[in-house]
Amino acid sequence: QGEKNLRELNWAPFPVSPKSVELILVTHAHTDHVGYLPALVRDGFAGEILATQATCELAAIVLRDAAYLAERDAEHAAANGYSKHEQPLPLFTEADAERTIGLFRAIDYDSDIDLGDGWTARWTRAGHILGSASIRVATPSASVVFSGDLGRAEHPVLRAREIPPGDRKSVV
């Protein structure tokens, strides 16, 4: 998906072994936030994927659809000879997507989730899409907030975004 140089990045080796990753925190279910997860699972990731309940449910739909389309695209490329590869492959399969969906664990908004070693994570409503959140990760000595994508302060359909707890010392 996207420009050629970005598509090629999907096929490059991940910078660390996916087997070494223990946990993934997800802000929302748009493809640019969850679409590579099945490739990580295919390559050995077996930890938990934490997200809000709505994000877990939407991600299941998005990933099944993306896998279906990727498999059909590969079949179409093979049948019509427009791939430079002798046997075009999808980035991930429907089986990879199903294994990924099985790793999702739903968490509640505004609850500190123990990540171990004194680290916690807290999801706060982002108002971007159903289930979206900013995630605050805190250690005993510091914290950082990853916003993902933010919605409007006053949204006509979704609950408005909320400000994550904690001090604001730096904004990047």
Question: What name fits each language-model region?
Answer:
Residues 1-47, 51-104, 150-161:
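Pre-active-site segment of Zn-dependent metallo-hydrolases
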Residues 21, 46, 141, 166-167:
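A general structural motif
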Residues 169-172:
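Conserved small/polar residues in nucleotide/adenosyl-binding loops
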Residues 106-165:
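Catalytic core of the metallo-beta-lactamase
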